[in-house]
Amino acid sequence: MSYDYHQSWSRDGGPRGSGQGSSGGGGGGSRGSGGGGGGRGGRGRHPAHLKGREIGLWYAKKQTQKNKEAERQERAVVHMDERREEQIVQLLNSVQAKTDKDSEAQISWFAPEDHGYGTEVSSEKKINSEKKLDNQEKKLLNQEKKTFRITDKSYIDRDSEYLLQENEPNLSLDQHLLEDLQRKKTDPRYIEMQRFRKKLPSYGMQKELVNLINNHQVTVISGETGCGKTTQVTQFILDNYIERGKGSACRIVCTQPRRISAISVAERVATERAESCGNGNSTGYQIRLQSRLPRKQGSILYCTTGIILQWLQSDSRLSSVSHIVLDEIHERNLQSDVLMTVIKDLLHFRSDLKVILMSATLNAEKFSEYFGNCPMIHIPGFTFPVVEYLLEDIIEKIRYVPDQKEHRSQFKRGFMQGHVNRQEKEEKEAIYKERWPAYIKELRTRYSASTVDVLQMMDDDKVDLNLIAALIRYIVLEEEDGAILVFLPGWDNISTLHDLLMSQVMFKSDKFLIIPLHSLMPTVNQTQVFKKTPPGVRKIVIATNIAETSITIDDVVYVIDGGKIKETHFDTQNNISTMSAEWVSKANAKQRKGRAGRVQPGHCYHLYNGLRASLLDDYQLPEILRTPLEELCLQIKILRLGGIAYFLSRLMDPPSNEAVVLSIKHLMELSALDKQEELTPLGVHLARLPVEPHIGKMILFGALFCCLDPVLTIAASLSFKDPFVIPLGKEKIADARRKELAKETRSDHLTVVNAFEGWEEAKRRGFRYEKDYCWEYFLSSNTLQMLHNMKGQFAEHLLGAGFVSSRSPKDPKANINSDNEKIIKAVICAGLYPKVAKIRLNLGKKRKMVKVHTKSDGLVSIHPKSVNVEQTDFHYNWLIYHLKMRTSSIYLYDCTEVSPYCLLFFGGDISIQKDKDQEIIAVDEWIVFQSPERIAHLVKGLRKELDSLLQEKIESPHPVDWDDTKSRDCAVLSAILDLIKTQEKATPRNLPPRSQDGYYS
């Protein structure tokens, strides 16, 4: 098949011999449907025979048809000028001739001043498709070797450095370690720390703990917060090995659920051992892109759970590790649940491996059962008594009367928070409704009538911030000194409570230090949490659940438990994430209570009634049951853990079959898995990258299209967090600064790129400039530095896989197109598709605004923090977004305006259709553009060549040589990039193409 230009183009507008274009979903529909009808209806009026509701339905139908026609007329026009059209025809004919004849095309099209696309197609041999199919399994195995050629190069995965060190027994080292420990015992610093350690409940159980661990392969240790299990158990094991003359054989790795925990615990243990952390001493830590490694043997390493999962790719048996301690497993995060199952399998091959599971008290038995009823041991906690108060106690104590506007929610949601359909929640809601009258009746025997009346009046489905403010005021005026810790579900509650307190003259004085604690807050503010206040100053910390386990604030005496916690769930039926404030679990409530009473007797105020307390879940739902599974599915395949569904079925709490099937379907649509659920070459690359699959695909395309540096900035931000902070009281200024950084890009992603590049420039000029820049634009320098480190890690992965030739994200060869905003947007589209939304201008009476729709959800909203939230002057009708989440509404997070060519070349399947008088080209049947049919066929042909080229690049990665103008790679990519770059800013709306040969330019 050849592509003919103008003179020999076939009558139907398509390539010669192509036949008539298909006429699918854009079909015209019947003429006059919904028109005036019969009878005396006319001039747009309804037919006379219609009555009542029928009239309303008639007008609604007519308005729908009117809207559809308006939308049809607003379709953007896909166009190209005659010169580009002729060049693309020649390019496609030449490539087609190369395929048909398997010989080199001698046509020369390249002329730099004429936008030509190469001179000839190179004579590289193509892989025979039949041979590829026959050798698919062998090819995938070879592909894995090609994809991760790190050990053959100078690149070493720094996060795996500790694992890859040898761990052979060494008698002379054993003796040295013993002598070193004996010397320590005479060190005044060590002796001083021993006095503290001996006060911990765990210290008195040292022999019992060590004997149990030495005599069993798996041990479960439970213990209250503050008992010393995290800091002491690892030291007991190490010292026991050293004292028995086996120190070199001991290599302990202890997982932590959070980065901050891994660092702070490692530093604490090092201090107790009279050492510095890392630097070849006995204790160190490893988190992503940051480490202080201990000595090779006779050591303790604290690390995040993800580090061990990463190690398993290099050494599936963790050969150099003697003890694995899985800490805080009661939190049930996704990674720790998966690691438990992997370790359970590993025990069959590593009979010498010791596994210690450490959990809160309440559910230790469940972990023991999962590991074949292994032995358990409990370490008692050490806290002062804490008095607990329920909502009715608080109302009675402070004589609280709510605003008259507050009314009970009439059980409109009860336990069914958000939009998550959980049967057990519905059952508890029914029980709550049933028991409520009897509970109120019983309360009247113990509390004043006014208290019970207030309790009935309140909408306890909401967090009553006025009540919390009144309670804080009561504590300050009536109770003894001591810090106050308030638990709230999210940023909006924290911000509002802060404003409520600061609106009162009393709290504006220097007698109070009010500290909001949230991931959006500047880090410098959060460090104040740990500092003791001067005499006469009361600390008030307003925090999310980060303060439950991740950090310890020693001087807290009063805890106010708001009773709610923000949880993300994944709705498999509607394929959408939801975030809502759920009731806390009993385990959460216990942890919160435990934050008081660390230094003296404490008080804990729970903002829910006794009936609610009795029906709380024992624990939060494990993360694996409320999150998308795509990234995990790729990990299962790259670690060779067997079939995805089979492996997941063996977890402690397996996810639903619907969630597993949906994730596998998404990965197949992304071409990461084939029909046999095996990794494709693209899937191998995506599994190796430490990001979710869509972001991984964006990274690969950033390398292929040579706009690496900005794309890595975007990828790092999406997989970690953006660098913006929101100081309380300055939200509007922060929004304005963010829009200033957007620079008319209509893109949250490019706003982050601009912020990052500005920071790099300021940093080059010196520390003062960097500090001023971050202050002016409300940026976190710590987060920006983390993004910088992550970009380096991504670039090293790409180097190891062969996609780039340098480990520097700023390598000039990998950034030829980094200054072109439109190409970067195309790469964003390539990664995030099919997360597409349609923009429709809505000319209201008061002001111009836009409405945004997605294919599956209908009307949605752009998130208020987006630079596009108030934008009305879009160049195109389409947005690509990173995340869609339902809270109070369905919001799109991190969105970018994209052009028609971005969607045509990097979207889904293309079809060419007719819609009444319009010739159209559609992507996945719903993203529709006007286009002369011959132009549509050229675009489709060019897209086919791009798909073929990308497949070859993924199967055999190597950088594009843009200097080799004879190559097919360079010719095809140059043609596509040229069309994207020259796409007009605005496409005329409400106008059909001028003629078959006409163009909008």
UniProtKB/Swiss-Prot annotation:
<keyword id="KW-0966">Cell projection</keyword>
<keyword id="KW-0399">Innate immunity</keyword>
<dbReference type="Pfam" id="PF00270">
    <property type="entry name" value="DEAD"/>
</dbReference>
<dbReference type="Pfam" id="PF07717">
    <property type="entry name" value="OB_NTP_bind"/>
</dbReference>
<feature type="region of interest" description="Necessary for interaction with single-stranded DNA at the 3'-end of the G4-DNA structure">
    <location>
        <begin position="842"/>
        <end position="853"/>
    </location>
</feature>
<dbReference type="GO" id="GO:0045944">
    <property type="term" value="P:positive regulation of transcription by RNA polymerase II"/>
</dbReference>
<dbReference type="GO" id="GO:0042826">
    <property type="term" value="F:histone deacetylase binding"/>
</dbReference>
<feature type="binding site">
    <location>
        <position position="328"/>
    </location>
    <ligand>
        <name>Mg(2+)</name>
    </ligand>
</feature>
<keyword id="KW-0677">Repeat</keyword>
<dbReference type="GO" id="GO:0016607">
    <property type="term" value="C:nuclear speck"/>
</dbReference>
<dbReference type="GO" id="GO:0005737">
    <property type="term" value="C:cytoplasm"/>
</dbReference>
<dbReference type="GO" id="GO:0005739">
    <property type="term" value="C:mitochondrion"/>
</dbReference>
<keyword id="KW-0378">Hydrolase</keyword>
<dbReference type="GO" id="GO:0045995">
    <property type="term" value="P:regulation of embryonic development"/>
</dbReference>
<dbReference type="GO" id="GO:0006359">
    <property type="term" value="P:regulation of transcription by RNA polymerase III"/>
</dbReference>
<keyword id="KW-0547">Nucleotide-binding</keyword>
<dbReference type="GO" id="GO:0003725">
    <property type="term" value="F:double-stranded RNA binding"/>
</dbReference>
<feature type="region of interest" description="DSM (DHX36-specific motif)">
    <location>
        <begin position="46"/>
        <end position="68"/>
    </location>
</feature>
<dbReference type="GO" id="GO:0061003">
    <property type="term" value="P:positive regulation of dendritic spine morphogenesis"/>
</dbReference>
<dbReference type="GO" id="GO:0043204">
    <property type="term" value="C:perikaryon"/>
</dbReference>
<dbReference type="InterPro" id="IPR011545">
    <property type="entry name" value="DEAD/DEAH_box_helicase_dom"/>
</dbReference>
<dbReference type="GO" id="GO:0002735">
    <property type="term" value="P:positive regulation of myeloid dendritic cell cytokine production"/>
</dbReference>
<feature type="short sequence motif" description="Nuclear localization signal">
    <location>
        <begin position="510"/>
        <end position="521"/>
    </location>
</feature>
<dbReference type="GO" id="GO:0003697">
    <property type="term" value="F:single-stranded DNA binding"/>
</dbReference>
<dbReference type="GO" id="GO:0060261">
    <property type="term" value="P:positive regulation of transcription initiation by RNA polymerase II"/>
</dbReference>
<dbReference type="InterPro" id="IPR014001">
    <property type="entry name" value="Helicase_ATP-bd"/>
</dbReference>
<comment type="subunit">
    <text>Found in a multi-helicase-TICAM1 complex at least composed of DHX36, DDX1, DDX21 and TICAM1; this complex exists in resting cells with or without dsRNA poly(I:C) ligand stimulation. Interacts (via C-terminus) with TICAM1 (via TIR domain). Interacts (via C-terminus) with DDX21; this interaction serves as bridges to TICAM1. Interacts with TERT; this interaction is dependent on the ability of DHX36 to bind to the G-quadruplex RNA (G4-RNA) structure present in the telomerase RNA template component (TERC).</text>
</comment>
<dbReference type="GO" id="GO:1904582">
    <property type="term" value="P:positive regulation of intracellular mRNA localization"/>
</dbReference>
<dbReference type="GO" id="GO:0010494">
    <property type="term" value="C:cytoplasmic stress granule"/>
</dbReference>
<keyword id="KW-0391">Immunity</keyword>
<dbReference type="GO" id="GO:0070034">
    <property type="term" value="F:telomerase RNA binding"/>
</dbReference>
<dbReference type="Pfam" id="PF04408">
    <property type="entry name" value="HA2_N"/>
</dbReference>
<dbReference type="GO" id="GO:0043488">
    <property type="term" value="P:regulation of mRNA stability"/>
</dbReference>
<dbReference type="GO" id="GO:0048027">
    <property type="term" value="F:mRNA 5'-UTR binding"/>
</dbReference>
<keyword id="KW-0175">Coiled coil</keyword>
<dbReference type="GO" id="GO:0003730">
    <property type="term" value="F:mRNA 3'-UTR binding"/>
</dbReference>
<feature type="binding site">
    <location>
        <begin position="595"/>
        <end position="598"/>
    </location>
    <ligand>
        <name>ATP</name>
    </ligand>
</feature>
<dbReference type="GO" id="GO:0032206">
    <property type="term" value="P:positive regulation of telomere maintenance"/>
</dbReference>
<feature type="region of interest" description="Necessary for interaction with single-stranded DNA at the 3'-end of the G4-DNA structure">
    <location>
        <begin position="491"/>
        <end position="550"/>
    </location>
</feature>
<dbReference type="GO" id="GO:0003724">
    <property type="term" value="F:RNA helicase activity"/>
</dbReference>
<dbReference type="GO" id="GO:0043123">
    <property type="term" value="P:positive regulation of canonical NF-kappaB signal transduction"/>
</dbReference>
<dbReference type="GO" id="GO:0017148">
    <property type="term" value="P:negative regulation of translation"/>
</dbReference>
